[in-house]
Structures are given as C-alpha cells and as structure tokens.
A protein has these predicted regions:
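Conserved N-proximal alpha/beta basic substrate-recognition cap immediately N-terminal to
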Residues: 2-128
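Short catalytic/ligand-binding loop motif for oxyanion handling, primarily in non-cytosolic enzymes
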Residues: 17, 61-63, 85-86, 111-115, ...
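Generic beta-strand structural signal
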Residues: 98, 203-204, 255
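Protein kinase-like catalytic core scaffold
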Residues: 103, 182, 209, 261-263
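Active-site flanking residues adjacent to catalytic metal/cofactor-binding acidic residues
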Residues: 105-107, 251, 263
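Short, flexible loop/turn elements at secondary-structure junctions
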Residues: 109, 188, 267-269
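Phosphate-binding site of ATP-dependent enzymes
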Residues: 134-240
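C-terminal active-site "lid" helix and adjoining low-complexity regulatory extension at the edge
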Residues: 227-228, 243-248, 255-294
Length: 294
C-alpha cells in the first residue's frame, strides 16, 4: 500500500497534544487506511504532505497559519478563515428598529472568546516576558480572574454557560451595545416541553453524524440527554456549509417554528475527556478523509 501523508495544521499556542479534539482519535484509524498523519504549526519546520487540514483553535485564523496552509496542494477548511457569529448569524439584533421580542446575548467569538483573550495576553510584552520565565499560564489565570470581576457586559470573554437572555431589547445593558466582543440575537430556542434543545451536525467530507441535546438551560450546557437523529441534516444547512467552505466541522442549530436557526459553527470540535463516548462518531467520520486521497 502506498503511504500517503496528511498534515494537521495547528497554531503552536493551541498545544494540540494536550487538548481533547475530535480529530485526534481519527489518527490511528487513518493509519489503518494507509494515511500517515503529522502535526505541524507555524513555528515548525515545513513538513511536506499530500493534503492538510487547517485546524487552528481561534475564531479568526492568524496570517502566519494561513501562509503555512498555502504551501500545501489541498487544504481542508482552507477557506474557513473567520467564524465570528456576525459572519453567519441571521438573527442579529441592533439597538434601534422594530422590537424583536426576547433576545439572547453571547460573544461574537467562538467558545466565549477565551482563546482570543489568552492570545491578547500572551502576545503583550508582559505575556512574552512571563513566557520566557515559564510563568505564562500563571499570568493568564490572574488575568482571567480579574476579567471575571469586571461587569458582565464589559468583559472581553464570557463562559458560554453565562450567556444571558432578556425578555426584551430594552432590558439589555447599555454596555453590551458598546462592547464589540458581544452580539445580541433574537432569542430563538428549540423547545421540547420545559427543555431547551440543540441539534448537532458533525461532518468530514461526505461522512456525518447528527444528534440532538436537551438541556434545562438556554445555553444548553447542563445536559439532560443526547440522542442520535435519524433524519439527515436539512438541505438548507448543507447550503450554509457549502457557502462557508467547511470540509470538516460541527454546526449547532435548532428548528424553531419550522425554520432553521444556526447557533454556532466550529472548525475544531472537541470531545469529552473520555474518548470512548465519541467512538461511534469517530469511526463514522474518519473514512471521510479518503476523498482527499484518490
């Protein structure tokens, strides 16, 4: 069997090997398919490969990582450079205009904006100094604690479980509208009885998994249950995927009043610390990579 090579392009600061990403348990399955996988970052020496995946855990991919991706002949997610919610949300609310009813406030950034907050700290001169002294994580923890003491509406990052809903736009704190890190959307939640629901579509090439989470909270974090969905993802969602240029990722959405509402898109989906809980999804998705190795 001809050995083929696949490069996962990360950002050095992502510490890929220390995190729990859905892509990681696929690597041994690809090895069985004759595909060797290497991990590369913008700080490493160039490693040649037949194809690559742009797997940078930031909302907006830095230029250095884009330059690395340009050196490969085929790049999965190569066009997915900016996944701020303002780039895809159809539910955005402005401060003026017709009353939208209940609203929901969250960050424009992916995963609450924590990665961007960390990057801003570590790229500052105190951050570079503390990194040289091996104290960078200490500095980040101190800054995060100080940030959490700020008024909620003025923060640069927010735990996703702390996103807030308001009965009307008039109740949204004035500071929210001045904070470029936050967005206000119409509160469009899929419901089943008293539970809030979120559907998850994860895919790699033509392979996919579809499920739905039920939760007691609108942020859908304290899970009541996760169940597979037999029905395929809606065609409308597939068109969004095509428009955004995703080859691999996860979309969170709901069906509200018969209409699709896209909540979030993610090009670096994670896993729980127990990889066995995702074994079925990994086995289903991994063969999708073969489309880039004809």
């Amino acid at each position: 069997m001809t050995r083929r090579r696949f490069a996962i392009l990360t950002r050095a600061a992502d510490r890929f090997a220390e995190r729990h990403y859905l892509i990681q348990p696929m690597i041994p399955l690809w090895r069985e398919l004759g595909i060797e996988t290497v991990i590369a970052s913008e700080e490493d020496s160039f490693v040649d490969a037949d194809a690559a995946l742009l797997h940078v855990d930031l909302t907006v991919v830095p230029d250095a990582c884009l330059r690395l991706a340009e050196r490969y002949p085929r790049v999965l997610n190569g066009g997915v450079r900016d996944i701020r919610k303002r780039t895809f949300s159809s539910s955005l609310v402005t401060r003026e205009g017709e009353d939208p009813g209940p609203v929901f406030v969250k960050t424009d950034w992916n995963c609450g904006g924590r990665a961007e907050f960390r990057r801003a700290i570590l790229d500052s001169w105190p951050g570079r100094l503390m990194r040289a002294l091996g104290l960078d994580e200490f500095l980040v923890r101190v800054c995060e604690q100080l940030e959490e003491e700020r008024a909620w509406a003025k923060r640069r990052w927010i735990h996703t479980a702390d996103y807030r809903s308001f009965a009307s736009r008039a109740e949204v704190p004035a500071a929210v509208w001045r904070n470029p890190n936050l967005i206000v959307e119409r509160f469009l939640a899929e419901r089943e009885g008293d539970a809030y629901c979120c559907r998850h579509w994860v895919f790699l090439g033509d392979r996919e998994r579809h499920s739905r989470t039920r939760s007691e909270t609108a942020a859908v974090k304290g899970r009541l249950s996760v169940a597979p969905l037999e029905a395929p993802a809606p065609d409308e969602l597939r068109k969004v995927r095509e428009r955004l240029g995703f080859d691999y990722g996860k979309f969170d959405y709901g069906i509200v009043g018969g209409q699709l509402v896209l909540y979030d898109v993610n090009r670096t989906p994670g896993t729980a610390s127990d990889p066995s809980s995702h074994a079925a999804a990994v086995a289903e998705l991994a063969p999708g990579l073969q489309a880039w190795f004809p």
